[in-house]
Amino acid sequence: MSKLILHNDDVNSTTKIASALIKCLDYELPAATQIIILAEGRKKGVIIKEGDFIELFMAQNCFEELNINTELIA
């Protein structure tokens, strides 16, 4: 099972990350807010989705278009 990891860096604002989670992964606002809180202060990032590699690859491309740092682990 593949994993998509969000790396929280100071370049991105919380509203930008929340908007990306909603756009790229169809998150609801409360879930997006919870992920942002979890990601704060974690150097390794936080897993935002697990599943099919192709689905996560497409989501990662969406995040890259928005200049948000993610990592896909196959």
Set out the residue ranges of the language-model regions.
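Terminal domain-initiation and capping elements
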Residues: 1-74
